[in-house]
């Protein structure tokens, strides 16, 4: 089968490698190179780099216009596989592929349609999430489900960990979905009454409000790693939080919210919140390395009693 692959994210790299080993990948659609670093030199993403190493045609259009459509048609693809590409496809584009178009989405659809399902699942304190391969339609993430698996979120620490799991465990579902398509199996229709949505995460979401519960703050910190990275201020300096846990307790209720009340080498840096104790495990000063709580504390022994804002 001649497959056209669309992705702009490293999460799809393992799928691209495996699908290229077993099928004829005739083209890869990915985002344009972006300026990076002080010199603003153009940075090649991992998807493009892998495709070029395999001598696969790479397309990086800003707009999916008629010229792009004609170019894709000239590759004579039979099926499109999409995994975190970043743009919405019009029907004219979807119609290029006679076998159809399938998409890998890291949630248990119809839950969390949209661009941030992994982060949103952690943020909301969900106990399970999953991976879905769906047949693509014009409406975002609303196509028939061809393959699906689930996992327990408690097995992971942060969004980074789940990204890695999804990256390594999506290919078998793709094969299951392809086999169903080729047999004429239309899959399972999503129940639109159970559909929920998630949105893009930006810098405006990253500030920690210590008046919230320790449970909610812990979820935010772990959800927002690697992006947009939750943060707060300490001594007029911005501190980035990379990983956290929490303790449900009524102790320290007389302490100021946001106060660093103790350091426990077996737990972490303990911070008073609106409900319970936030246990900070990994953090970072702007421009410095990410440190575990022990290393951070040993370099900042005057932390106890200070207040995050």
Curated annotation (Swiss-Prot):
GO cellular component: cytosol
Catalyzed reactions: L-methionyl-tRNA(fMet) + (6R)-10-formyltetrahydrofolate = N-formyl-L-methionyl-tRNA(fMet) + (6S)-5,6,7,8-tetrahydrofolate + H(+)
Top EC category: transferase
Protein biosynthesis is among the record's keywords: yes
Tree of life domain: Bacteria
CDD domains: FMT_core_Met-tRNA-FMT_N (cd08646), Met_tRNA_FMT_C (cd08704)
Homology family: Belongs to the Fmt family.
Record's function text: Attaches a formyl group to the free amino group of methionyl-tRNA(fMet). The formyl group appears to play a dual role in the initiator identity of N-formylmethionyl-tRNA by promoting its recognition by IF2 and preventing the misappropriation of this tRNA by the elongation apparatus.
Name recorded for this polypeptide: Methionyl-tRNA formyltransferase
Gene from which this protein is expressed: fmt
């Amino acid at each position: 089968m001649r497959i056209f692959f669309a992705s702009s994210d490293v999460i799809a790299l393992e799928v691209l490698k495996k699908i290229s080993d077993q099928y004829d990948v005739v083209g890869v659609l990915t985002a344009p190179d972006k300026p990076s670093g002080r010199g603003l030199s153009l940075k090649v993403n991992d998807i493009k780099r892998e495709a070029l190493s395999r001598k696969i045609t790479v397309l990086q259009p800003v707009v999916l216009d008629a010229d792009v459509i004609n170019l894709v048609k000239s590759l004579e693809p039979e099926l499109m596989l999409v995994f975190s590409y970043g743009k919405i496809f019009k029907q004219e584009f979807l119609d290029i592929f006679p076998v159809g178009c399938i998409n890998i989405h890291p949630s248990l659809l119809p839950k969390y349609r949209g661009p941030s399902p992994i982060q949103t699942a952690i943020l909301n304190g969900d106990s399970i999430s999953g991976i879905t391969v769906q047949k693509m339609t014009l409406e975002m993430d609303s196509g028939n489900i061809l393959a699906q698996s689930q996992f327990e979120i408690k097995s992971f620490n942060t969004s980074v960990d789940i990204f890695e799991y999804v990256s390594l465990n999506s290919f078998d579902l793709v094969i299951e979905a392809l086999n169903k398509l080729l047999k004429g199996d239309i899959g399972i229709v999503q129940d639109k009454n159970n559909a929920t949505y998630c949105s893009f995460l930006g810098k405006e979401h990253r500030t920690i409000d210590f008046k919230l519960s320790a449970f909610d703050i812990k979820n935010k910190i772990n959800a927002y790693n690697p992006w947009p990275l939750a943060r707060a201020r300490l001594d007029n300096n911005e501190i980035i939080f990379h990983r956290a846990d929490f303790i449900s307790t009524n102790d320290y209720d007389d302490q100021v919210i946001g106060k660093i009340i103790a350091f426990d080498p077996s737990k972490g840096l303990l911070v008073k919140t609106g409900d319970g104790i936030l246990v900070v495990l990994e953090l970072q000063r702007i421009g410095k390395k990410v440190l575990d709580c022990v290393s951070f504390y040993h370099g900042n022994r005057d932390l106890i009693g200070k207040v995050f804002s």
